[in-house]
């Protein structure tokens, strides 16, 4: 029954309307019983007494005609004589339920307040209860005989047009309300159905169909969030495809080269050529090994929930160790490396930070002009740790700088790197809640700046 949100909302709303109508009826019934019933009884009793006074003062001899006239004026009247013979005028009562004790009470000269004393019933409105006990009664004198006269207004006749009007109004109200509820429910459910279809497309890998924001309420916000999610998923999917293509290319190229070298090695070559081929194969295998290590490290960084950042990192020792390890490359290009390294302590992952700093220093050595200078600085300034590496090589155009940290990015085809070093470095710095940036110009060279919060 409630398999769809559309049905659920429609049934809930209709139930609320019907429940509200029932509660309103009960409230009105209670209000009539405790507030209006006595007033209604007194008003009808006053009318009946005025009728008796007029009957007495006018010396009406034809009682039948007089009460028939009152009945024609939309009153229901019952007259009981001393022998308990009952005569009715006006519209007939639905039931004759008055007790003999009530009749005797009136014949003895006491007034009867049946409307005021009508017992309370939850689902029956006493005002419309067309029974003889729901009347007021007083004695009349007719030819020296007492008559018990009971009267109530003919509600059905008096309010017949109003009841018709009220019934039409209620039917129209319920009909229009239910129609509008169904229509408004559909307008609410329609964008949700569209979102459902969109999620099914996303589930099947279709990230190209946009989700339009058709509203400005909570559902519109949901549409906006779904569209943002779709764009993010599309970006991730594009990156995944691009990543797979790049990995395939990076693996295929050295494998093709190795295959060609092995084919050459099988032919008749002299010892010098054989040694050269073996050396090239060794370089390609080393390249593949480094690529595999970097891919594994990237995978580890992308799923970093298991990583610990609780090492007490001694940056001065860490950077000094990297410089000592890279001394051969520095000497080979006859570079001058100047360092100004303060004693800075930091809580993080020592292995990853060593990798990030090593990548920056290795790049500075690799892309420096021979006989140039490299400047390495580390200091703490007002709670922020700064690590900068500057080299004097070819400047990096501003249009290229935003792409330096993309995975597999290479400035030119001759670059024999994997294009993953700076991407790895950026991921490591971000995991430590830091930032990395680059500036490059002819005067100052190229500077990579890493900033880390002292309290990580």
Swiss-Prot record:
Do the record's keywords include Phosphoprotein?
yes
The entry's localization annotation reads: Cell membrane
Q: Which InterPro entries match?
A: Bact_Sensor_His_Kinase, HAMP_dom, HATPase_C_sf, His_kinase_dom, HisK_dim/P_dom, HisK_dim/P_sf, Sig_transdc_His_kin-like_C
Q: How does it sit in the membrane?
A: Multi-pass membrane protein
Q: In the record, which positions carry Phosphohistidine? A: 249
Tell me if rRNA processing is a UniProt keyword of this record: no
Pfam short name (any one): HisKA
The molecular function terms in GO held by this entry are: ATP binding; phosphorelay sensor kinase activity
Membrane-traversing stretches: 9-29, 164-184
Lineage top rank: taxon: Bacteria
Query: Where mainly located?
Result: membrane
Q: Which residues form the Histidine kinase domain?
A: 246-456
**Keywords, A to Z?**
ATP-binding, Cell membrane, Kinase, Membrane, Nucleotide-binding, Phosphoprotein, Transferase, Transmembrane, Transmembrane helix, Two-component regulatory system, Virulence
- What EC number(s) is this enzyme filed under? 2.7.13.3
Q: What is this protein called?
A: Heme sensor protein HssS
Please tell me the species this chain comes from.
Answer: Staphylococcus haemolyticus (strain JCSC1435)
């Amino acid at each position: 029954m409630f398999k769809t949100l559309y049905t659920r909302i429609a049934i809930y709303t209709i139930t609320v309307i019907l429940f509200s109508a029932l509660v309103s009826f009960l409230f009105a019934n209670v209000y009539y019983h405790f507030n209006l019933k006595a007033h209604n009884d007194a008003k009808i009793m006053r009318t009946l007494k005025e009728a008796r006074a007029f009957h007495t003062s006018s010396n009406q001899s034809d009682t039948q005609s007089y009460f028939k006239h009152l009945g024609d004026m939309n009153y229901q009247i019952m007259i009981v004589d001393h022998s308990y013979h009952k005569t009715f005028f006006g519209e007939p009562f639905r039931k004759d339920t008055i007790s003999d004790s009530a009749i005797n009470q009136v014949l003895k000269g006491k007034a009867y307040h049946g409307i005021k004393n009508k017992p309370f019933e939850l689902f029956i409105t006493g005002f419309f209860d067309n029974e003889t006990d729901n009347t007021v009664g007083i004695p009349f004198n007719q030819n020296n005989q007492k008559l018990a006269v009971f009267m109530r207004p003919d509600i059905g006749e008096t309010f017949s047009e109003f009841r018709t009007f009220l019934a039409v109004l209620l039917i129209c109200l319920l009909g229009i309300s239910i129609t509008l509820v169904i229509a408004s429910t559909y307008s609410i459910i329609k964008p949700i159905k569209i979102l459902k279809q969109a999620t099914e497309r996303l589930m099947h890998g279709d990230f190209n169909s946009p989700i339009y924001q058709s509203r400005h309420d909570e559902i519109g916000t949901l549409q906006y969030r779904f569209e943002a999610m779709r764009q993010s998923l599309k970006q991730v999917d594009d990156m995944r495809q691009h990543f797979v293509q790049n990995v395939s290319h990076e693996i295929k190229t050295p494998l093709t080269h190795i295959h060609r070298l092995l084919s050459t090695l099988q032919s008749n070559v002299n010892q010098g050529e054989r040694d050269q081929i073996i050396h090239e194969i060794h370089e390609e295998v080393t390249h593949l090994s480094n690529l595999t290590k970097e891919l594994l490290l990237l995978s580890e960084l992308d799923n970093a929930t298991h990583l610990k950042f609780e090492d007490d990192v001694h940056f001065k020792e860490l950077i000094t160790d990297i410089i000592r390890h890279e001394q051969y490359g520095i000497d080979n290009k006859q570079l001058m490396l100047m360092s100004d390294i303060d004693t800075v302590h930091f809580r993080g992952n020592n292995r990853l930070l060593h990798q990030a700093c090593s990548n920056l220093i290795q790049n500075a050595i690799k892309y420096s002009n021979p006989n140039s200078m490299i400047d390495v600085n580390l200091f703490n300034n007002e709670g922020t740790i700064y690590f900068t590496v500057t080299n004097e090589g070819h400047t990096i155009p501003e249009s290229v700088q935003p792409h330096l940290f993309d995975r597999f990015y290479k400035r030119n085809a001759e670059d024999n790197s994997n294009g993953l070093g700076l991407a790895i470095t950026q991921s490591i710095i971000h995991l430590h809640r830091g930032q990395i940036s680059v500036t490059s110009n002819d005067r100052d060279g190229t500077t990579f700046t890493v900033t880390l919060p002292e309290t990580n």
